[in-house]
Amino acid sequence: MDVLRSIALFVLAALLEIGGAWLVWQGVREHRGLAWIGAGVIALGLYGFAATLQPEAQFGRVLAAYGGVFVAGSLLWAAVVDGYRPDRFDVAGALVCLVGVGIVMYAPRPS
C-alpha cells in the first residue's frame, strides 16, 4: 500500500510542480499576467508540501527519485497540454528515468 501511496504522491507532486512552472511560464513568457504567475507560485509551493507526504523518510532519496518522475511527467505534460510530440529518444529517456525511480524508491533494502 505504501508503494501505491508513494506513486500517487509523485503524480500529485509532478502535476503541481510542472503545472506551476507552466503557469509562471504562461504569465511571463506569454504575457498572461500576474494572476497566472500567482497561481503558478501557489502550485509550486504546494508541490514542496506534497513531497513531504512521501512514506520514505530520506529526503535525498525522495528527491532523487522524483527527478525521474519529473522528466517523464514533463514530456507527458508537453504532449497533452502543448501538443509536443516526443520522439523515440524522449520516450526511451523517460522510461530509463522511470526505471531509476523504481530502483531508487522501491528496491528491497535490508532493515
Swiss-Prot record:
Pfam families registered for this protein in UniProt: UPF0060
Keyword check for Membrane: yes
Keyword RNA-binding tagged: no
Subcellular location field: Cell membrane
Transmembrane intervals: 7-27, 33-53, 62-82, 88-108
Major subcellular site: membrane
Topology in the lipid bilayer: Multi-pass membrane protein
Swiss-Prot/TrEMBL keywords: Cell membrane, Membrane, Transmembrane, Transmembrane helix
Gene Ontology CC: plasma membrane
UniProt cross-references to NCBIfam families, sorted A to Z: PRK02237.1
Membership in a protein family: Belongs to the UPF0060 family.
HAMAP family: UPF0060
Name of the protein in question: UPF0060 membrane protein Krad_3114
